[in-house]
Amino acid sequence: MYTQLVLKQFKCFAEEQRIPLSQITILYGLNGRGKSSVLQSLLLLFQSMKNNNSVESLYLIGDVINLGKYTDVLNSGARENSFSIGLACKTENRTDTLDIEYSSAVDTPFVAKMQNIVINDQSRSDSQASLDSTEEEGNKITTSLSDSVCLQMLKDINYIAANRLGVSNLESRLGANVAITPRGENVLNVLASASPNLLKEAEVSLSQILSGATLKINNEKEDSIEIYMDSISNSKHTYKPINVGFGYGYILSLVVQTLIAPQNSILVVENPESHLHPGAQSRLMEFLVTQSVEKNLQLIIESHSDHIVNGVRIAVRKEKISSEKTSILHFSRDVQTEGTPTVEEIFIDKRGNLSSYPEDFMDEWTKQLEQLMM
């Protein structure tokens, strides 16, 4: 699991920013304060590792994330034409650190090229590796890259994006080994190709989160798969998703992706609360915490919901997860430092109490109540 992310001159982070990560980490704060940039840095590495089994070239446009040109990700006030992304991680047997410096590519504006890499405090520039080293030294560098736990762990990431789609009634059949995309596509193919237990687990989970659900898959056609659902459990009548509450189809990809996430993997989720009643948001967080504990699943969640935060607090209070395995990161901005984000770690104690309540953190209801009482 990742324990730290370090950014420098990447997007809004002009100076080096160390971002602690726990088994369950919630990124919280006003819009435009750097939360998405944190996720995007990790997802860029994931995208390059997933598609090329390497991070020597960082592809800024791909099937996971699209950030545009190199100049779009380099901090606007950068003193050098480079940015760096660092990671720290641990497994049962070892800890690992990785820091990569990237600069612009000569041949394309949509790729960042590795300039220097530091693995477990041992540095080697990419240019030296390719121009000045012997073949034996070059092989050692390649080996050290392939042995990096932090790099290999990138392959364990699953991502559900903020701009995900609600499930459609019909999907073209794509065959085996289909994955759910960041936008939530292919979920019907995954349900159809998996064991019947997965469909039942998804139905039970949806029912618990949304206070009732029935799911049925029509898997008999050769070229397509259909889904029907209802907002009542064990319903004899099911309907196209468009004719049931939108939240049902919208949340399905997240629920299924969580259920199929392998042991010890990583799930990155943006705005899980979207289109859900506050009570459903709380129960969704209970579901996510349960899955995290059962499978040692690392959750990195960006959210604007007090109910998501409180869901983690309640889980700690009920001793479903240790307080040491959770953290809340509050993102704010100091106008005196020209918009540089500030990241404050808020701790949850054993009783679910929070270590601090900074401005704009879970205080909107209090602000509104004060106006109502004037």
Q: What are these language model-derived features?
A:
Residues 4-6, 48-252, 257, 262, ...:
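Phosphate-coordinating catalytic segments in nucleotide- and nucleic-acid-processing enzymes
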Residues 16-22, 258-263, 290-294:
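Phosphate-binding P-loop
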Residues 1-50, 54-59:
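Pre-Walker A-like glycine/lysine-rich segment at the N-terminus of P-loop NTPase domains
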Residues 77, 283-374:
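C-terminal lobe/lid and adjacent interdomain/linker elements of RecA-like ASCE P-loop ATPase modules
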Residues 270-271:
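Walker B catalytic acidic pair
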